[in-house]
Amino acid sequence: MVREEVAGSTQTLQWKCVESRVDSKRLYYGRFILSPLRKGQADTVGIALRRALLGEIEGTCITRAKFWSVPHEYSTIAGIEESVQEILLNLKEIVLRSNLYGVRDASICVKGPKYITAQDIILPPSVEIVDTAQPIANLTEPIDFCIDLQIKRDRGYQTELIKNYQDGSYPIDAVSMPVRNVNYSIFSCGNGNEKHEILFLEIWTNGSLTPKEALYEASRNLIDLFLPFLHAEEEGTSFEENKNRFTPPLFTFQKRLTNLKKNKKGIPLNCIFIDQLELTSRTXNCLKRANIHTLLDLLSKTEEDLLRIDSFRMEDRKHIWDTLEKHLPIDLLKNKLSF
């Protein structure tokens, strides 16, 4: 963080992107400005955004690779220059772009001699490779080479203690951090009591999203963190009152699910996707992260299951219920899902 004195003027608080460039397929850069801020506010915003950008942005990466007839990760395979460990390290570096949630399967199946790159990965339709030229392995002989892969969207650095399994499946210490680096600097402007601060924010990403997209997602995450305090203030209620207000369950899950399955309307619950329910993007993303994709998946969960979902709030329960009330037949809700 750098602090400098510059000349400036007082205006309504605003932000804009002052520089944006693509250095390579896996390196995007953006520079943003926020001003004018009162003394001390730039540090507050800068620290919060930097931490949110580095730790809260989700990324998609390869988390597991399965080799056939390989005893351990330090093995070498005849006809391949790289060892298994080197191939795993190369797979770890592959940058993917996707909005998928849950685990997806991918694979590599080629015949040598061939220089294998990220372009040779067979991916599900929802996943895209950022840089198809990223190296994986070099086959020097006419051999068949196949790997089964698992892909997952997550955040932060994920590591597993168990490094190898008897079936040839090896976990990859996934780095789900699309933001490579963040730097901010503060400039003071004005004189005397009219002094204000200008915040400059620099963001570098790996190409799976732009710095502007990363800044938007980080800002939304920070807003979501403070929303409960805002609601408590507006409604004039304490946390204990909020807790008591949400104590009655919004679903009698298993019982209601059974009733729904038996209802005369014959609603195909497994064919109604949560994307069709007009949930907010935040609530829908929370559910998808927990592999809840259909109405059947949702109603199969208990209240405790939902509250264990990362970032799922008590307010989300009410929002889900209001949405179900809107989209399902009114008589069905009254007769089968009443509480």
UniProtKB/Swiss-Prot annotation:
Gene Ontology CC terms, in alphabetical order: chloroplast; DNA-directed RNA polymerase complex; mitochondrion
The organism of origin for this protein: Heteranthelium piliferum (Elymus pilifer)
Record bears the keyword Transmembrane: no
Residue numbers spanned by region Alpha N-terminal domain (alpha-NTD): 1-233
Secretion signal span: none
GO biological process: DNA-templated transcription
GO molecular function, one term: DNA-directed RNA polymerase activity
This protein's encoding gene: rpoA
Top-level class of the enzyme under EC nomenclature: transferase
Subcellular location: Plastid, Chloroplast
Record-given protein name: DNA-directed RNA polymerase subunit alpha
UniProt xrefs under SUPFAM superfamilies: C-terminal domain of RNA polymerase alpha subunit (SSF47789), Insert subdomain of RNA polymerase alpha subunit (SSF56553), RBP11-like subunits of RNA polymerase (SSF55257)
Free-text note on domains in this protein's UniProt record: The N-terminal domain is essential for RNAP assembly and basal transcription, whereas the C-terminal domain is involved in interaction with transcriptional regulators and with upstream promoter elements.
